[in-house]
Amino acid sequence: MIAVNSRNSLNADMTSLHPETLMVHGGMKGLTEAGVHVPAIDLSTTNPVNDVATGGDSYEWLATGHTLKDGDSAVYQRLWQPGVARFETALAGLEHAEEAVAFATGMAAMTAALLAAVSAGTPHIVAVRPLYGGSDHLLETGLLGTTVTWAKEADIASAIQDDTGLVIVETPANPSLDLVDLDSVVSAAGNVPVLVDNTFCTPVLQQPISHGAALVLHSATKYLGGHGDAMGGIIATNADWAMRLRQVRAITGALLHPMGAYLLHRGLRTLAVRMRAAQTTAGELAERLDAHPAISVVHYPGLKGQDPRGLLGRQMSGGGAMIAMELAGGFDAARSFVEHCNLVVHAVSLGGADTLIQHPASLTHRPVAATAKPGDGLIRLSVGLEHVDDLADDLIAALDASRAAA
C-alpha cells in the first residue's frame, strides 16, 4: 500500500505496484515536498550556474550522456530538462527498463539509436519488414551511415555480420499487423541488441524487455499521449544504452520540448483505460468488418486463426486497437472507401481518442520500396474511443458506397 503522503519517496521502490498504478504515479517523486499536486512546466531554456568551474563540469557531464547530479546546474535545456526526466522515469517503470530517453519525435528516437550504433563501429542493421514507413525509409537511404539487411524473422541469425549493431523489429507491424515472436528474434540475434518498436501495443499489452529486447521504442505521439496534441519519441533501455542515447540527443539537439513532456506524461495516467477501451471496440469492429463482402481479409491479432503461434497471452495480453483490411477492389475501392467515411477521420497517425483511417501505400509507407510497399487495397484503421455502433455504421456505409460507385 502507498502511504497517504508518500509522494516524496514515490519511485524509490515501485516494482511491486500494478501497471495501472505505475501509470498514475510514475515520475511523480517529490511533488508533496514541492507543495504541488502535478508537475510544473519549466520552460527555461537556460539555467544559472554557480561559477565557471562547476558550470563547466556540469556541461561536460551532461553533454557526454550522464544524468543530472543533485545540486548541479542543468546549464541548458538541450542537455537536461526536469519535465522530460519525469516522463522518462514513468515510461521506464512501465517497460521494466533501467532508464528511458525521450526525444522530440519517434523518428528522432530511431535516428539516435542508429547513430549510437554507427558511433560504436557497428553500422550494419538487420531489420524485419514491415516497419513504420519512416523507419523503413531512414534505413533504406543509409543517410546516417548505416547499411541494412532486410531479413525474414526466420533468417535473422544468418543475416548477422561482425559489424551488426542492431536487430530492428516492430510487432504488431505497421501497417499489416504481422506478429513477430520476440523470444525467437532475441534468440536468433544472439549478442546483437534487439530494438522493438512497441508503438502499437504500448506497455499495457506488451513488454519487450521481459522477452530479452535491449531497446523498446515508442512514437509517444500515438497512444502514450493519446490525444493527438503532442509529438515525442522515447526509448526504454539499460543504463549503458541510455547514456549513449542521451549523448546523441545532446549533440543533435533532439530533446523533447517541456510542454510535450508534460502532455505525454499526463497521457500515461489514462493509458491503460484508453488502450483497453479502444481494444474492446477494435475486436468487435474487426468481426463486423470481416463479414463485409467488400473486404477480402481483415488483419487483427484477435481474430480467429490470425495468431497461429499463440503470441496472444504469451507475448501480448490483447489484440490492440489497430486494424488493417484489404479491399477486394484494390486501390480504387480503397480510395473510395476512405473518402466516403464521415465520422471516421481520414488522416495519418494513430492512438488518439478519435478513429483514424488511411491508405498506407499513398501516405505513411509511400517512401517504401515497391517490392516491400503495402498492397494498394490495404487500409489501416486506428480505433478510438467512440461507440462501436457509430463507428460500424460509418464504416459499413462507406464500404457500401464504395461498392456502389465501382
Curated annotation (Swiss-Prot):
Give the CC-aspect GO terms: cytoplasm
Q: How is its activity regulated?
A: Is inhibited in vitro by carbonyl reagents, completely inactivated by DL-propargylglycine, and unaffected by metal-chelating agents.
In the record, biological process GO terms are: cysteine biosynthetic process via cystathionine; transsulfuration
Question: How does acidity or alkalinity (pH) affect activity?
Answer: Optimum pH is 7.5. Is stable at pHs ranging from 6.0 to 8.0 for 24 hours.
> Which biotechnological applications are listed for this entry?
The recombinant MGL protein cloned from B.aurantiacum eliminates L-methionine in cell culture, and exerts strong cytotoxicity in human cancer cell lines in vitro. The cytotoxic effect of this protein seems to be attributable, in part, to changes in methylation-sensitive epigenetic abnormalities involved in oncogenesis, including DNA methylation.
Looking up SUPFAM superfamilies in the UniProt record yields:
PLP-dependent transferases
Amino-acid positions noted as binding pyridoxal 5'-phosphate in the UniProt annotation, renumbered to this chain: Y76, Q77, R78, G106, M107, S219, A220, T221
- Give one Pfam family: Cys_Met_Meta_PP
Q: Which EC number applies?
A: 4.4.1.11, 4.4.1.2
Query: What residues does L-methionine bind to?
Result: R380
Q: What does the annotation record about activity and temperature? A: Optimum temperature is 25 degrees Celsius. Is active between 5 and 50 degrees Celsius.
> Which residues get modified to N6-(pyridoxal phosphate)lysine?
K222
Per its UniProt record, the required cofactor names are: pyridoxal 5'-phosphate
* One Gene Ontology term of the molecular function aspect: cystathionine gamma-lyase activity
Enzyme class, UniProt record, top EC level: lyase
The text of the family note is:
Belongs to the trans-sulfuration enzymes family. L-methionine gamma-lyase subfamily.
Q: How does it assemble?
A: Homotetramer.
Q: Provide the function of this protein.
A: Catalyzes the alpha,gamma-elimination of L-methionine to produce methanethiol, 2-oxobutanoate and ammonia. May be responsible for the production of methanethiol associated with desirable Cheddar-type sulfur notes during cheese ripening. Is also able to catalyze the alpha,gamma-elimination of L-homocysteine and DL-selenomethionine, but has no activity toward L-cysteine, L-cystathionine, S-adenosyl-L-homocysteine and D-methionine.
Instruction: Supply the name of the protein.
Output: L-methionine gamma-lyase
Q: Which organism is it from?
A: Brevibacterium aurantiacum
